[in-house]
Amino acid sequence: MKFNEKLVLNSYLLSLFGVSSFEELVKDLKASRLEELDENDNSLFYHQLKDNLIEKNKLINDDELLEYDENIVRHTKTMGRDIKWKYFQYLSLLFVEIYLDKYFDDKEQLLEDLNTYLREFNTNIEGKEKLTEYKHTELNKLALYNATGSGKTLLLQINLLQFNHYAKDKVKINKTV
């Protein structure tokens, strides 16, 4: 089994949008005009996702999507630069928003949801290739993969703001980092 076929969390996050592949999610997000904000400071990516995803298939509601978008825009403005995210950067930030929200809101539910998804994921895998269920202690680790030149340093700065937003009053943060 290829590495990219084992990305359960990625597959789970895609399923929240009612799609089974990254290509399916991004097919209508690649236009550079979507890198702008509307008059209410919502990204045009948000509108495209909200308007084009099939309502009956997606598991993330429009209010949650709006909240995540508002957080991304707010954190981006905090950087004090005119940053225009490419679709893959925006989705990276959006996936982190979703994960952190679920993690800090209800870790047990996140664990249950991931393992339920993993059991279904494993039905198409044979023998030794089957993936083991997540453990509670593994949920505090999140790995992102972005290509060379994709703005990882800038994304990481926003990821820190995202973490601080969701962790506020929930965990003691080691300030030495």
Task: Indicate where each model-derived feature is located.
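N-terminal helicase ATP-binding lobe
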Residues: M1-V177
